[in-house]
Structure formats: structure tokens, C-alpha cells
Amino acid sequence: MSDIHFKKHRVFRETEDVIFYDISVDESNAADLVVHTGAAISPPNDAVGAKQFYKHEFQDDYNRVVQGCRTFELVNGNWKYPYHIVHLNRASGALIIPKNTYHRSTSGKDGSIVINQAKRYAGFQASEEFIPISCAEQHWLYKILMNEKPVIHTLGE
């Protein structure tokens, strides 16, 4: 079984040029809208060009693309295969990123919009959960990025 999981949507109804989706995430108690207006990396590389990641200690992410495409890099030392690259579009469903997973996302030149239907745990503080972590300062993270072949997932497979 893969370490990568998705929360799929349900189509209520389709008409010409319109699709009605149920995108409920029962676990969610928060919602964030993340807009990349053009080519973007979040978090951006650090001052020396090293990749940076977010890691939430008190939040699981359920990232769902609503417009465009977004690519996520995920690193979790507790997984059998610790390095994954996941390509998402609107049909993929919500990518579940469990707490304590290092992650970053990239959009192409046209940008993308993601809704994160997050599950926040007691102790969550926005000022502490969104601090970029550079792989230049985390030796084990740098080692995984350099030595592990990423498992690549495309469009919610």
C-alpha cells in the first residue's frame, strides 16, 4: 500500500459545461485558499538556492486543485519510500499530507489555485506552522533528496 493517499470527490450532477462536486472532507476543521498567480514555488528556495519545505506539527493538509495543475514534493522519513513527487489537477482529489511531512509545491507559468481543507490539532499556531525549513540546514532531508529516487504519482493514481 502506498504512503500517498487522496480524498476523492463525488460528482452530484453534470450538465453541459457544468459539474457539481461534493468535495467534503469530514476530518476538516479549517480551509485555506492558496493561489499561485503564475509560475511559483512555495516555499521558495533559500538565499543559497537550496530547496525549502514546510512541515506542520499540528495540521494535516488535504490539498485539492480547483484550477490549473500543482506538483507537490513530499518527504517523510517514516515512510517505506520517503520521497514522493505528486502531480495534481482538478480530477485528482485532495492530496492528504499528514502532519510532520516535509512538503513544497510548484505551479507552472499559468499558476494554480488550491483549497486546503485542513485538519488542525490542539496546539496549532499559524505563526509556528508555516516557517520554511531549508534542506541546507537539515542534513537528513538533504541526504534523502540527493540519494533517494522519488516515487512519482500522476493525477491521483
For each feature predicted by the language model, list its residue ranges.
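Histidine-centered metal-chelating micro-motifs
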Residues: 92-95, 99-104, 122
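Active-site region of the double-stranded beta-helix
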Residues: 1-90, 107-112, 118-157
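A structural signal for short, well-ordered beta-strand segments and their strand-loop junctions
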Residues: 96-97, 114-116
